[in-house]
Design a protein with these regions (language model features):
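Peripheral, non-AAA+ core regions of ATP-driven protein-machinery
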Residues: 1-215
Length: 215
């Protein structure tokens, strides 16, 4: 059979960078490394689905494209659910508060579920922008533009902060055929990246407007 099971582990080898991410598949011929894990994690990605955003994360030294999904639905509970799979639970509550305060998008009476597709565990704050745009898309029942990737950390004042290795993230997205990127202004490339239109933003409201205007 060609069916595979995906395993993700941090390398402990002295010959690799600290926290290097290794992605492996168990096949009928045994365990093998995957040279292009983004293709695996995006293999089931469907464009133009409300609540779905593709982000470029950087675990170790490898840029990795991952789909982040959000579902926001009316709650019948006194304290609505806030559930995150593959992303930081406490950070989700903070991002919901930032969305409400700085973009006027409230979900105080709604359950919020967020998932990093494919079993990936994302630990870096550069996932913030993807999570917030996914939540906003689910609430507004509005899909993100086709071919869009995002990354960026959110501050409590609604600012979008830069992520490390921004150029590597953008080049990986372009290599995989993505055509638009919403990123922190400080990560804007010095020279254009072929095939990739970059929207550099300072604030959450700018990012939401860019996603809407480029649809």
């Amino acid at each position: 059979s060609s069916d595979t099971s995906i395993f993700i582990k941090e390398s402990s080898s002295a010959s690799t960078e600290p926290n290097e991410l290794g992605v492996f598949a168990m096949t009928d011929r045994g365990l093998r490394g995957i040279s292009n894990p983004s293709a695996i994690f995006l293999s089931e990605h469907r464009e133009n689905v409300p609540g779905s955003v593709v982000m470029v994360t950087q675990e170790g030294t490898r840029p990795l494209l991952v789909e982040v999904q959000a579902l926001v639905d009316g709650s019948h509970l006194p304290s609505p659910k806030r559930l995150s799979v593959g992303l930081d639970q406490q950070r989700l509550s903070m991002l919901i508060a930032v969305l409400h305060r700085h973009a006027g998008i409230g979900c105080y009476d709604q359950d919020v579920f967020v998932n990093a597709v494919g079993g990936v565990k994302i630990t870096e704050p550069a996932s913030d922008l993807a999570v917030m745009l996914a939540i906003a898309g689910s609430i507004g029942n509005r899909a993100m533009p086709a071919g869009l990737v995002v990354f960026g950390e959110a501050g409590l004042a609604g600012e979008i902060r830069p992520a490390p290795r921004g150029q590597e993230r953008l080049k990986e997205a372009a290599k995989l055929g993505f055509s638009k990127a919403i990123i922190p202004r400080a990560n804007a490339p010095k020279t254009p990246i072929e095939g990739l239109e970059v929207f550099a933003v300072d604030r959450l409201t700018d990012a939401i407007a860019a996603a809407r205007d480029t649809a």
